[in-house]
Amino acid sequence: MKFIDEAKIEVIAGDGGNGVASFCREKFRPFGGPDGGDGGKGGSIWAVADRNINTLVDFRYSKMHKARDGENGRGADCYGKGADDIKLRMPVGTLIIDNNDGELIADLTEHGQEVLIAKGGEGGWGNIHFKSSTNRAPRQKSEGKEGERRELRLELKVLADIGLLGMPNAGKSTFISAVSNARPKIADYPFTTLHPNLGVVRVSHEKSFVIADIPGLIEGASDGAGLGIQFLRHLQRTRLLLHIVDLAPFDNVDPVKEAKAIVKELKKYDESLFDKPRWLVLNKLDMVPEEERKKRVKDFIKRFGWKGPVFEISALTHEGCSELVTEIYDYIAVQRQAEQRSEETPQMVEAARGIDSIDPDDPRFKIID
């Protein structure tokens, strides 16, 4: 399936049905009074996050989504039928943005999350609502309200724990295929990866994390060179970035120069992404003679000016990969625990202790300023 991570759509909720002015006409009740029913509610449009969908391709070719109008009211106190709502299923990680003013309407981060994106119009009132002690035969009625109409921009940011950075042919796709169930296209030419790939890395039956591989960056990507930086937003939700470097490039380019170019483009794109935790992964050690490895690694780290974690691997032979995966999971586990602790509010803590609130006059408690 073609990977599409951007789309523009128009959503039109249904109009409410009109109320009706009607009077009861039955045998022996020639002046039975008003009995006009209300109009039905127009259909609304909802966005629903679905983990079984991983692309916005359906919305690239289906741009207009319109809900049905509510039915008009009828006599004999018959109300119009409300229209059914429409649910648009989107990938988890989709941002829904108003295309006119740039307002962020919703961020779909959880499977099954539902967000109202266009509200259906309310039905109009029938004349039965306008009856009063001074107006026994009202002829007033009201029309149904118009449904909301919006132009939306959908942007997909994949949800992953780990993001891979690197030049084309650095071995990112080989690495993700070595440690996960992902099977991206792998070849010996640049820009083999044309769209993000996700893989689930399983450390054990109950321990896993998600890793994202995006197309390689080159110098000048922020100015549109290569595939540009259009896919970098997929790394914004990650907890950790792995900067993969080809330590044995076939064209004899300087790995340090290429690594610095990646960092430069990252900073140009987004300071927050640049400040995200980053580990250095030196790949293709199987291509470096055994006696030169230590010297080449040391020289690279010194010239690159790197002071963070460093891992030496060969994605092709899987050398060093299991150790790296273990370190990644340990790091992710700590991050997840920290996030869970930060989500605990004082109210949650009190509820866990069986205390809903503290009465200042309760002698069991002493308030310390």
Swiss-Prot record:
GTP binds at residues 166-173, 191-195, 213-216, 283-286, 314-316. InterPro entries: G_OBG (IPR031167), GTP-bd (IPR006073), GTP-bd_Obg/CgtA (IPR014100), GTP1-OBG_CS (IPR006074), GTP1_OBG_dom (IPR006169), GTP1_OBG_dom_sf (IPR036726), OBG_GTPase (IPR045086), P-loop_NTPase (IPR027417). Residues 128-148 are annotated as: Disordered. It is an enzyme of class 3 (hydrolase). GO terms for molecular function: GTP binding; GTPase activity; magnesium ion binding. Residues 1-159 form the Obg domain. GO terms for cellular component: cytoplasm. Its main location: cytoplasm. Its cofactor is Mg(2+). Residues 160-333 form the OBG-type G domain. It is found in: Cytoplasm. Its EC number is 3.6.5.-. Keywords: Cytoplasm, GTP-binding, Hydrolase, Magnesium, Metal-binding, Nucleotide-binding. One of its GO terms (biological process) is ribosome biogenesis. Mg(2+) binds at S173, T193. Belongs to the TRAFAC class OBG-HflX-like GTPase superfamily. OBG GTPase family. An essential GTPase which binds GTP, GDP and possibly (p)ppGpp with moderate affinity, with high nucleotide exchange rates and a fairly low GTP hydrolysis rate. Plays a role in control of the cell cycle, stress response, ribosome biogenesis and in those bacteria that undergo differentiation, in morphogenesis control. Monomer. This is GTPase Obg. It comes from Herminiimonas arsenicoxydans.
